[in-house]
Amino acid sequence: MKRLLVVGMSTVLLVIGLPAHAAIKAGANCPTIGAKKISGDKEFTCKKSGSKLVWNKGVVVKSKAVLFSDFKKSKLKEDLTFSNLGKNYAYVPYLAWAKSGEKIVKFEPTNLKLTILVGPNTDPINKSPNTAVNLVSKMYGDYTQASEFVLVYYNFEDIAWAEKLVDEYIGKNGGYDTSGDVKKLCPSRNNCNSAGALTNSVTGIGLTMVTASDQERKNPIFFSGTLEAHEYSHTIQKKQYFGRMPPGLAPPQWLTEGGAEFIQTASVHYQSFDKYLTDRNKVTEYLYSFKDFTNSRLDAFLNPSKLGTNWDLWKGYDGFRVYDIGFMVSEILVAIKGPNSIMEIFKLMGDGVSFQDSFYKVFGVQWDSAISSITQVLADQLS
């Protein structure tokens, strides 16, 4: 009401106030040749075009990398967008963490049947996995989830036992031949430290296999709940499209794994931003250490041709890149639009919508435009 009153009383006041706040557009009139002004992530220069003075197309301003200690612990005074992402990147972790925590507090866990099965020779590292699973369930309490979630804990001695359970709960309805998955996660007694999520397309049951050799008992991944949270995130992702998505479509692997990596961290540590940052640092430390992810390399990784069609697009990369780079992109998306944004893409693709069109439906911005901003901002941090 107050702003409308000012407009009605004095057009002059409005005109004077615009240059300080309005976004600059290429080709718009500018004051003097050589004048420069930053708008969004670009610096524009005033140039002469014919008889007019106009702003040029602008150049992207390279931002300084944000140090771990420089991340803000407060909300932004303006809405975060892809256009102002560069200058506000220091706020991204807190915004993503806070928006996720708000959903966890708001929702109750879904009416989930949690079944925990432990092999006869197995001593599970995490004795209370239900805590982490319930936090993820609450974060996505407004999404359809599995009718039952089965956690199967086993070690090398219990492989045959675990194989029977996978056959019982999943059988031939896992979307691919899952008969070798149990051994693949635990090929030897001392190489048994992984997990994998499966979903039965007929019953809707989600099953996660969890293994861990004795040397992993002090590894936080196996006792903090983040592993179970990660795998249950996959179960929710799959529930949005499994058995419905048309052939030729597949959510990007970096969104699938990076999204789950973000969800596990934000859910388990929803009460402590400092703990969230600590785990975030562990996930992304390789990227920050090597500093070799340029804009072009990131674009090739995140936006290959045929994006949204299959996972073979990432076979040529180190396997963890879909986790750490995917985490950083998912964090940006959640900071801008909340945790539902990354889950809604799976749901829309289940309806037969391409990844690019799904992205536009969720964010109201074309994917090619958004990824240009994302890769530039991440390159500022990682190159």
What spans do the regions from the language model cover?
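A generic secondary-structure signal for well-formed alpha-helical elements
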Residues: 12, 140, 236-240, 263, ...
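Acidic/His/Gly-enriched intrinsically disordered linker/tail segments
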Residues: 245-324, 336, 346-383
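Tryptophan-rich substrate-binding surfaces of secreted polymer-degrading and adhesive proteins
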Residues: 22-62
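Non-catalytic architectural context of zinc metalloproteases
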Residues: 62-217, 221-226, 366-371
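Zinc-dependent metallopeptidase catalytic helix centered on the HExxH motif
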Residues: 187-293
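Stable alpha-helical elements in mature extracytoplasmic
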Residues: 125-132, 136, 224, 228, ...
